[in-house]
Amino acid sequence: MSAKDVKFDTAARSRMLRGVNTLADAVKVTLGPKGRNVVIDKSFGAPRITKDGVTVAKEIELEDKFENMGAQMVKEVASRTNDQAGDGTTTSTVLAQAIVNEGMKAVAAGMNPMDLKRGIDLATSKVVEAIKAAARDVKDSDEVAQVGTISANGEAEIGRQIADAMQKVGNDGVITVEENKGLETETEVVEGMQFDRGYLSPYFVTNPDKMTAELEDPFILIHEKKLSSLQPLVPLLESIIQAGKPLLVIAEDVEGEALATLVVNKLRGGLKIAAVKAPGFGDRRKAMLQDIAILTGGQVISEDLGMKLESVTIDMLGTAKKVAITKDETTVVNGAGEKAEIDARVSQIRTQIEETTSDYDREKLQERVAKLAGGVAVIRVGGMTEVEVKERKDRVDDALNATRAAVQEGIVVGGGVALVQGAKALDGLQGANPDQNAGIAIVRRALEAPLRQIAENAGVDGSVVAGKIRESDDATFGFNAQTEEYGDLFSFGVIDPAKVVRTALEDASSVAGLLITTEAMVAVKPAGKGAASPAMPDMGGMM
């Protein structure tokens, strides 16, 4: 086992503090509408340019083990805020730095670290309550666009596109962000349920120009197992021909004789038909087939439920207004399922989302909700160069997360003012002893740090701006760093999601409290440079 280097109290805290400040100083230059870029070297290809706090934080690794521990703890703040709210990572880093620096001074002055932490926790909970109370619901798509614009560093086009996408797919819809090949940033909305399985044979194509199979008002047969023979389906197929409608077959696979029969039938101009594989795998496939059945008002033909293909009747099939199939994906538009059943299915999946601990499962469940309840929108981010596209994609991701957070918990005044106003909730708050009161005072001072940093990044004195806002009785009065004007921030469109502000403060004070109460640090001792390899033992008596 390698030797360890151990540091105690002041020696430990000072080294850790250096690491905290190194990381936070690199991250905080990105804060606000006039925040600067950070250029990150890559081992291959062009360097990455970003204004995303968590991206900068994740790249930082310090040589000194003790300094690196401090940096990694603050990196944890940014990562946690990013996971919970998707934005506000720079704000949480700035808050953590401010609380840690003030807290370390108090510890050096002889105060009890545990009481300081209790005071910090007490103050944080009070300010969080104030932020929740001050939040108001998002009224319209213009406010959604404003939130997106602020988070995308003032790029109104990004805010508008996100607002339009959310309006089209609803608050439950899935919006994904991809890189575009061209210069333009564009939004594509897919209505209805789409899954990534295409037609099993190109002979099913009805539109040769687009190479798509389009079925108008079709019946939909949903089968859990493979179809290798159509013999059991003959009575059903005769009923469908009499009804004069097309048929879509969704099954685990359609193979051999069954597929050949369907293709020959289509080429001879008999039944208009197409077949696709079922989406997903294993248990997820069963769940997705059930989703399709509920959406289209049909039933999953499953042997587990004692159903046989021979006994399937036309009323067990689903229907939809239209089905469009390409070689890669199938889209079911306007399924004929009962709204009450679809709503019940959505709430059932939402319960699973709340209970799951896996990020992957949560993402897949959210996709299923979107396909049932709303739709799917894709924002394709364009730019002149690959570096620019990646930088813009970071900002679009942030803006998208911020708008989702705004819809969930409402909005508060932006520009760091919500935290300064939240500090008023600490007036008259007393801890159990003077050291706890010092912890409360630390939070009060730290709450101004994001506002000051936004002003400093805009080239304005942060102390002057903070002083003016403290003196104002108007809760929405603040400094618009983009235009360098004072006034009502709501009317300027400078707004933040309450969830982002709340999460940033909670995560920052949590990790800062741990850093302040650190008394010893243990790290692996670096191996001495040029250390000689151990000599061979004396083998005695060898020739």
From Swiss-Prot:
The main place the protein resides is cytoplasm
Q: Which residues bind ATP?
A: T30, L31, G32, P33, K51, D87, G88, T89, T90, T91, G415, D496
- Name of the top EC class for this enzyme: isomerase
Q: Does the keyword Transmembrane apply?
A: no
The places in or outside the cell where this protein is found are: Cytoplasm
Q: What is its EC number?
A: 5.6.1.7
Gene Ontology molecular function, alphabetical: ATP binding; ATP-dependent protein folding chaperone; isomerase activity; unfolded protein binding
Query: Could you state one GO cellular component term attached to this entry?
Result: cytoplasm
List the catalytic activities from the record: ATP + H2O + a folded polypeptide = ADP + phosphate + an unfolded polypeptide
* Biological process, per Gene Ontology: protein refolding
Keyword annotations from UniProtKB, A to Z: ATP-binding, Chaperone, Cytoplasm, Isomerase, Nucleotide-binding
| Alphabetized SUPFAM superfamilies for the sequence | GroEL apical domain-like (SSF52029), GroEL equatorial domain-like (SSF48592), GroEL-intermediate domain like (SSF54849)
Q: Among its keywords, does the record have Isomerase?
A: yes
- Share what the entry says about its subunit structure, partners included: Forms a cylinder of 14 subunits composed of two heptameric rings stacked back-to-back. Interacts with the co-chaperonin GroES.
NCBIfam families for this protein: GroEL, PRK00013.1, PRK12849.1, PRK12850.1, PRK12851.1
List the HAMAP family.
Answer: CH60 (MF_00600)
- Function of this protein? Together with its co-chaperonin GroES, plays an essential role in assisting protein folding. The GroEL-GroES system forms a nano-cage that allows encapsulation of the non-native substrate proteins and provides a physical environment optimized to promote and accelerate protein folding.
Concerning its family, UniProt says: Belongs to the chaperonin (HSP60) family.
Could you tell me what this protein is called? Chaperonin GroEL 1
Species this chain originates from: Roseobacter denitrificans (strain ATCC 33942 / OCh 114)
